[in-house]
Amino acid sequence: KFKIYIGMIAGVGKSYRMLQEAHEMLENGVDVQIGYIETHGRAGTVAMLEGLPVISRKKIFYKGKEVEEMDLDAILQLHPELVIVDELAHTNIEGSRNEKRWQDVMELLDAGINVISAVNIQHIESLNEDVKGIAGIEVKERIPDKVLQDADEVVNIDLTAEELINRLKAGKIYRPEKIQLALNNFFKTENILQLRELALKEVAFRVEKKVENEIVTGEKGIRHEK
């Protein structure tokens, strides 16, 4: 099974929710591992990692610097029932087996490992232009819409504009020196309202498509018994 948490913008709580779910699964006896999580130094997210089994990241030297990537082979070898993989749109370092993290996820799913992942709407290929129109930002890292189509479940982490701005002002999203800049740019109330609407529409569209597919598949599988 493949589940994706979608967010309208950074800081809505996708990573936190995934870790929350990992704790719930662990308590229910599920073999869950953290394949990759991006805490962004947020205290709440860091605290949620406590008590969860984390697969060490792979250290790679690239252009004279040590960088860390998700260790795909280690996950495949451990073969947990469920793995948490954050930052679905991430581009892997040059020389990695797959160019994109979503391709790593496909490999994990093919190996029979359940995956929970997360992405913000600006990284979805078909919504890229819409987000650019709303916020004036073009994002280079994108995932094809097919990745969302392949998901068994797409869940929107929804917050009101007021809740999100309060989180930002309280220092729960960015460091203090970045807060004002964010409020003046991406985190303007009118931007958030439009991005929120976009995220809600996208998830509604995905659910509708899934229901349509299930009806078609169900009809094919109906046996008429006398």
Give the location of each predicted region.
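Conserved RecA-like ASCE ATPase "motif II neighborhood" in helicase/translocase motors
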Residues: 62-87, 98-101, 135-138
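Conserved P-loop
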Residues: 2-77
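Short, glycine-rich nucleotide/cofactor-binding loops
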Residues: 6-15, 93-96, 220-226
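Long, charged amphipathic helices and adjacent flexible linkers at domain junctions
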Residues: 179-225
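Conserved ATPase-coupling elements of RecA-like P-loop NTPase cores
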Residues: 87-102, 126-129
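Internal gly/pro-rich beta-alpha loop/helix module
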Residues: 117-180
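Loop/turn-to-beta-strand initiation segments
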Residues: 31, 79-82, 111-117
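Substrate-engagement module of ASCE P-loop NTPases
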Residues: 100-120, 143
